[in-house]
Amino acid sequence: MAIEVQPAVSPHLVVSDGAAAIDFYVKAFNAVELGRVPGPDGKLMHAALQINGSTVLLNDDFPEYNDGKSSTPIALGGTPVTIHLTVTDVDAKYQQALDAGATVVAPLEDQFWGDRYGVVRDPFGHHWSLGQPLREVSMEEIAEAMKHQQ
């Protein structure tokens, strides 16, 4: 029997404490844990969550498999990646993330591209943007609005 494959893009996050990260994502983003695989030393080798209808993978940091270097955003001094969640009721979802322990990177505001949008940093250094479309805006309108941004 053939396995049905659904093409997808799923972020795979490296965190300093996988169990705590799962707890945070459940509280902050209503994540559903799909499964976890602990290693012999108790560190999390692999976990799968569903957040906002998409799969997010994560594991504990394993410097011993990376030339002794940590690869968490905190150890690297930040992250160049932001994971975006398109949601309804963005004000409540943003506050939920803050209440769970996230910190503000960009405050929640109505944006020129038509979304109400903000960015938070989770306790593990990963950035999450939350946006709710409020109105349709053409690419031409966005380009024109960009001319007036500081």
Give the location of each predicted region:
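Vicinal oxygen chelate
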Residues: 1-12, 22-123, 131-150
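Short acidic-aromatic low-complexity motifs
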Residues: 15-19
